[in-house]
Every structure is written in structure tokens, then in C-alpha cells.
């Protein structure tokens, strides 16, 4: 297959269909992530054209490196002890950026979860391109509140909508009670449950101005006590 060094290894094929991978390939090109240049992602050059192409489906969040994901990926790579040798679950993985960073930081396994089949295809292609065989794309319904045997939960950019933020917090708190470490990242969106989270550090992240109405976002990395 073109675009991933000619071949997608067998462990990635299960999360792709011809239709979803064709759309991801045709709508994106590989590019280094601005704040995480160790990772390349299939990224859309023209956001609104892709939004129009996928208007019958979930929004194409998988086609862009969002601010929270860039921040959490940077944190994990700079602090590999948070994931090294551990089973990791990445919530609402989108492009797979955070999951790939966790794999590069030495995670034992990484479940990169999303509900959008195009996101799962993007994760598949991006993980293969970055040589991250620990990453396994999976569907995950947050309402099920089942984090499996994950020892670390990573969640970036999940607090942008009221109902989703509430559901995500329930999921994260359940995982924390079960003993998993939880790290989240967000650029101060309206529904971040700051009263429940402990700030760890902040980053100034370059973002697409056409999507965020600014060229830089301040992202906070949080832990869940």
C-alpha cells in the first residue's frame, strides 16, 4: 500500500476497510507534528473541504493534531516513565498521536480507542508509518466505563462538549478507582473539570489558526488524583 513505506503490516489490517482507508489517504498527507516532530501523521491540508466531504459522518477530528493531543504526546515523550513497560489506553485517540507517543516512550501495549471508523483507519495508517506495533486501534464506548486491564489512561481533548466531558470524567474516575494512573490534557475549553483534576504542567502549542482562531494555545497537562 502506498504511503506507509509500501506496506501495512498484518497487525494493523484489522482496523481498516477499503472505503475508510481510501478516504483517509485521499484527504491527507504525511506531515511532522509541529510540537512533536518525532511523530508524523496523515494530516488534512484544507480542513473545511474535508469537513464537507465527511458531513454525513462524525467530524474528521482524526485529520488534525489538536492542541491537547500535541501537549500530552510531548509530555509522555519527555517523561517516558509515565508509560514505559505499562499497558496504556488512549481515550478518543483521533489520529493516534498520543498513542504513538506512548509507544515510542516504551509502553508495553497501547489501545488507541475511538468510535469513528475513519479515526480507526487513520490510527492504523499512522501507527504503521511511525513503526509503533504496540498500538492497537479499538472501538470504545465511554458509556461502558470499561478500561480493561490498562495501567495508564491518557485522554486529550475530551472536554470540548458538555455531555462528552461528563461521560469522560465518569470513565476516568472509574479507571482511577481501579488503580490506573490517569493523565489528561486540554487547552482550557469550557467543560474541563478543573475541580477534579490536578495540573501538572503547561505548554504553549502551535495550532491551525483556521480551526482554533489563534496560532497558539496554552495546554495544561492534568493528573487525576
Predicted regions and their residues:
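S-adenosylmethionine-dependent methyltransferases
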Residues: 4-225
